[in-house]
Amino acid sequence: MSSTSLLDEFGTPVQRVERAIEALKNGLGVLLMDDEDRENEGDLIFSAQHLTEAQMALMIREGSGIVCLCLTEERANWLDLPPMVKDNCSKNQTAFTVSIEAKEGVTTGVSAKDRVTTVKTATYFDAQPEDLARPGHVFPLVAKTNGVLARRGHTEGTIDLMYLANLVPSGILCELTNPDGTMAKLPETIEFARRHGMPVLTIEDIVDYRTGIDLRNEYKSGLVREVSWS
C-alpha cells in the first residue's frame, strides 16, 4: 500500500495540515513524516508554548529520548547558541546548537519536569542567554529561514506549523521509536496516531500548503513574541 493510501484516513493534504494547525492551537501533539527518500521517519511534535510535563514524558517514553527544541535562526542568535560543531558534516545537515539547561528551577535537568522548565526558559519572550546553562539535556535545532521551502526537514516543518498556527515560533520534536528501539516508519506512526488521537501529516503537505503563502516576513519578525503562557 502506498504512503498516500495509508494517509487517506487523515484527510486530504490540505485537511491534514489544517487539522495539525488546529491540534497545535489546542495544545495537542501532531505527527510529522518527512520524505520517503530522506529519513522517512515520524516525529512527535508539540508547541513550546503549550508544552506540558505529560507531553514531555510521552516523548521520552515513546521516542528516541533526544528531545529537540526547534528555533528560528534569530532566536538562536538572541540566546547566543552557537553550532554544536564548526564543521557540520551530518548527512542531512541537521543544525544542532550546543545543548542547554535552565539555570534555575531544575535538578539534574533530565526529568520531564526539568526539560519542560528548560524549554519554557529558552522560549519565554524576555529570555536572556544567561538564563541557560550549557551543556544540558535539551538539544536546540535551528530552522532554515523560509522553512520547508528552503529545507525539507522536521525542524523546518515544526517551525512552519507554529507560524501557521499563530503560536510562538518554537516547537519540540522527538523521533518516534518502536518498542524494539527501531525507528517508526509510516505504518507504525499511523498506529501511534490512532492510539493517541493525533493528526498525521507530511513535509510534502506543508510544502504544498505553503505554496502561495509567504511566511518570510514572519520569519524575519520571529526573534521575540510576547505570549500568555498556559
From Swiss-Prot:
Catalyzed chemical reaction(s): D-ribulose 5-phosphate = (2S)-2-hydroxy-3-oxobutyl phosphate + formate + H(+)
Transmembrane segments: none
Residue numbers binding D-ribulose 5-phosphate: 38-39, 43, 151-155, 175
Residues bound to Mg(2+) 1: 39
Keywords recorded for this protein, A-Z: Lyase, Magnesium, Manganese, Metal-binding, Riboflavin biosynthesis
Residues holding Mg(2+) 2: 39, 154
Keyword Iron: no
GO cellular component, one term: cytosol
Cofactor note: Binds 2 divalent metal cations per subunit. Magnesium or manganese.
A single GO molecular function term of this UniProt record: 3,4-dihydroxy-2-butanone-4-phosphate synthase activity
Cofactor: Mg(2+); Mn(2+)
Site (Essential for catalytic activity): residue numbering on this chain: 137, 175
Enzyme class: lyase
EC number: 4.1.99.12
UniProt subunit comment: Homodimer.
HAMAP family, A to Z: RibB (MF_00180)
Family: Belongs to the DHBP synthase family.
Physiological role: Catalyzes the conversion of D-ribulose 5-phosphate to formate and 3,4-dihydroxy-2-butanone 4-phosphate.
Protein's name according to its UniProt entry: 3,4-dihydroxy-2-butanone 4-phosphate synthase
Organism of derivation: Vibrio harveyi
